[in-house]
A protein has these predicted regions:
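Hydrophobic anchor at the start of a short beta-strand
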Residues: 152, 225-227, 249
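Short beta-strand/turn micro-motifs composed of small residues
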Residues: 156, 230, 253
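Functionally critical loop-and-helix segments that line ligand-binding/catalytic clefts
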Residues: 62-98, 102-104, 244-293
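Substrate-binding cleft of extracellular glycoside hydrolase catalytic domains
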Residues: 82, 88-214, 220-222
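Flexible, glycine-rich phosphate/dinucleotide-binding loops
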Residues: 126-127, 161, 235, 258, ...
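Gram-positive cell-envelope targeting signals
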Residues: 1-61, 65, 219
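Aromatic-lined carbohydrate-recognition surfaces of secreted/lumenal glycan-active proteins
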Residues: 219-237
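Structural recognition of alpha->loop->beta junctions
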Residues: 174-188, 192-194, 240-263
Length: 293
């Protein structure tokens, strides 16, 4: 009987050990599950907060070392449907830019209008194959504009990838000027193309700026004044303008008055202007500097 009682006690102890072991496992599982729930809840709340909390706005500004424009919004006006700018020191000239898109132009009618100058496209580089092309109307337009007594400037639409290509574009322009005198600058007009297959789709701001520099250097070494054309997006996102301050700036901004706060010599204010002698919409410009005649 004593052995039987002792055996029963041992069995009870074993049973208690098994129950204690099972309880420990259960508690561990519950603790692990609780930790997992807390972790998942934390991740959810963090993700939800990121989705519903707006990102802080990032302000973008052009380097303050650029000189101010010096233009006053109060001096802008309108006469006969054209923009004007008249201050104590500046009376802006009205001009248009012309390419083969306008095809035939009645230059005498244009010269008899308030338009005092034209900026002619000399050529362009293809954004796909990169071929350099002369504007088919350039030679005719240049001769006719000079004969009509209009001031003349030039631009080249670039899709250069390297400074060497930009120099090639500049020399193409120079080869087309022949013996003609021009009064206004020769502008480098690089613009982004909304096509994923465009050759310049991945070009950097540093590369674009270097191309503009080489183009302008080549033009000025030949004795002409050089400039760079840009809109606000190109100014803020593509060019390092402080590296181009030695050249003239031609701003495109289609507003009542330009908001760009830094110095520029010419303002393209619309691409839907109408002038005598030109069919359809045309780019209109105000020039604030005395470049030409």
């Amino acid at each position: 009987m004593a052995q039987t009682a002792q055996t029963k006690k041992k069995r009870k102890k074993k049973k208690r050990k098994k129950q204690s072991s099972r309880s420990g496992v259960l508690i561990a599982v519950l603790v692990a599950a609780l930790i997992l729930v807390v972790f998942v809840l934390f991740r959810f709340l963090r993700s939800h907060s990121a989705e519903t909390t707006p990102e802080p706005e990032v302000s973008v500004s052009v380097a303050p070392t650029l000189p101010p424009s010096g233009l006053s919004a109060q001096c802008f006006g309108e006469s006969d449907g054209y923009k004007t700018y008249i201050s104590d020191t500046v009376t802006a000239k009205l001009g248009v830019d012309i390419s083969s898109h306008q095809e035939w132009v009645d230059w005498e009618a244009l010269a008899a209008s308030p338009v005092g100058f034209v900026i002619l496209r000399a050529g362009y580089r293809g954004y796909g194959d990169g071929s350099v092309n002369i504007d088919p109307y350039f030679a005719e337009n240049l001769a006719a504009a000079r004969n009509a007594g209009l001031g003349v400037g030039v631009y080249f639409f670039s899709q250069a990838l390297t400074p060497d290509e930009a120099e090639e574009e500049a020399r193409t322009v120079l080869s087309q000027l022949a013996d003609y005198q021009i009064d206004y600058p020769i502008y480098y007009d690089w613009e982004p193309i909304s096509d994923e297959n465009a050759r310049t789709a991945t070009i950097s701001a540093t590369e674009i700026t270097s191309c503009a520099q080489r183009f302008c250097q080549t033009i000025e070494q030949a004795g002409y004044r050089a400039g760079v054309y840009f809109n606000l997006d190109i100014a803020l996102s593509y060019y390092h303008l402080t590296d181009l301050m030695d050249y003239e700036f031609w701003l495109a901004e289609y507003q009542d008055t330009p908001s760009y706060p830094f110095a520029f010599g010419m303002w393209q204010y619309t691409d839907q202007g109408t002038v005598p002698g030109v069919t359809g919409g045309v780019d209109m410009n105000l020039c604030f500097k005395s470049y030409g005649n």
